[in-house]
A protein has these predicted regions:
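Bacterial N-terminal signal peptides that target proteins for export
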Residues: 1-12
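Sec-dependent, cleavable N-terminal signal peptides
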Residues: 15-18
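Juxtamembrane/transmembrane-helix boundary motifs at the membrane-water interface
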Residues: 42-49
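Loop-centered beta-sheet repeat module
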Residues: 185-241
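Short, contiguous, pocket-lining structural segments
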Residues: 153, 202-212, 243-247, 254, ...
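Outer-membrane beta-barrel pore domains
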Residues: 49-51, 92-96, 117, 126, ...
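Outer membrane beta-barrel
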Residues: 27-41, 53-185, 209-214, 218-225, ...
Length: 387
């Protein structure tokens, strides 16, 4: 109830402003939403090597969005979602468009990074969960890995400047640069604490007063009707501790192609992060004399999606995570550890705006990369609706 109350206090004033900002004839509004009920069955959820380190069973994800065009140059968006994290306010911002090539975004939003973030809503992709580089809590052994490289969505407070430029009718360039509060963790932590960036944490104030920043550039080339290729690159940097001593640097590249009824997608992410070494905590590798160590977390996925008919879509995906670097002796992960996942799934349209999703996953965990040491199975069945 407290989370719901906080959301109401945050979102209600902006929603009222959107609804009453101008006479009905002068403002265009759009209200949309989606809901997904997913059941995740993991046969070894309680008896496997990691124990019950997964959000299996039923989970619900709901998203409601209100968008309004206040004028030819000003628009506003508010979005609330509900899921395993409780209530969240991932979107509450204004866009001021000077031209197609220059748009200012101010408020709370997910900064431009990667290609998946654009379609991270469950209604916009064929599987029940995110690719592993962007995992937000549906992966197996989630606490061991502390989610993905960059859990999506990743809303933050700040400002973004971006735009789109067309080169004729066949080529398009998108760009964005932003300054945000940045990810954070308390003093002495060895990894980011993602909950501190979420509304449910109850405190969205920057812990060190120094903004993080980054940007993205993407180019799209069109080859006839229904055929295009997009290539993009993204970067993000910030300090995460109260004293601004330790940093994270995230980079990514993406490639996607649409060829008739088939879509191909490939993304690669890496996060390099420094952290303090506590002399009282034993680590697996000798600690540097400086008291500062680092690790890298890599993630990638490749998937092919094809619309077989007007109602049936099939998907194949391979994705994984790889961590390299020092960690506490108590961690079950070695200094070189990886997880691989192989997914086959599909969707069935039951009615306009209503789809059934099903997928099977083979997981492989290893502390001896690239060998697959421990195998687990998982199965998703979900129903998703949009309006």
């Amino acid at each position: 109830m407290r989370a719901l109350a906080r959301f109401a206090l945050c979102a209600a004033p902006l929603a009222v402003a959107l609804l009453r900002a101008a006479p009905a004839a002068a403002i265009e509004r759009n209200f949309a939403g989606s809901a997904q009920l997913d059941y995740l069955f993991v046969p070894d959820a309680t008896s496997g090597p990691a124990g019950r380190d997964v959000y299996d069973g039923f989970t619900t994800e709901v998203a409601l969005k209100l968008a309004a065009d206040l004028s030819d140059h000003l628009s506003a968006n508010v979005k609330v979602c509900y899921g395993c994290h409780g209530f969240e306010l991932p979107m509450a911002y204004f866009d001021f468009r000077v031209a197609d090539e220059l748009v200012f975004r101010v408020g709370r939003f997910s900064p431009s990074f990667g290609a998946f973030n654009i379609r991270q809503d469950p209604a916009n992709h064929a599987t029940s969960d995110n690719p592993l580089p962007y995992d937000m809590g549906r992966m197996l052994r989630l606490t061991q890995w502390n989610l993905g490289v960059l859990p999506s969505p990743f809303p933050d407070n700040g400002v973004e400047v971006g735009g789109t430029h067309w080169f004729g009718e066949r080529a398009q360039l998108d760009w964005a640069a932003y300054a945000i509060s940045g990810f954070r963790a308390p003093t002495g932590a060895t990894d980011l604490l993602w909950i501190l960036s979420q509304t449910r944490s109850g405190n969205l104030i920057d812990n060190n007063g120094r903004p993080g920043g980054g940007g993205r550039v993407a180019a799209t080339f069109r080859f006839g009707d229904g055929n295009d290729v997009t290539v993009g690159g993204s970067v993000m940097y910030g300090t995460w501790d109260p004293a601004n001593r330790f940093y994270y640097l995230i980079g990514g590249g993406d490639l996607s192609a649409r060829i008739g009824r088939t879509q191909l997608r490939l993304e690669y992410l890496v996060r390099r992060q420094t952290f303090p070494v506590d002399p009282a905590v034993p680590f697996k590798l000798p600690a540097p004399a400086s008291g500062q160590d680092q690790f890298e977390k890599h993630g990638a996925y490749i998937e092919a999606e094809r619309a077989m008919t007007e109602t049936v879509t099939l998907l194949l995906r391979a994705d994984g995570l790889y961590r390299a670097g020092n960690n506490p002796l108590a961690s079950p992960l070695a200094t070189r550890a990886a997880v691989f996942r192989y997914t086959a799934g599909g969707t069935l349209a039951l009615a306009p705006g209503l789809r059934l999703k099903a997928s099977g996953e083979l997981w492989a965990f290893t502390n001896d990369v690239p060998y697959h040491q421990e195998l687990e199975l998982a199965f998703h069945l979900s129903l998703v609706g949009t309006f």
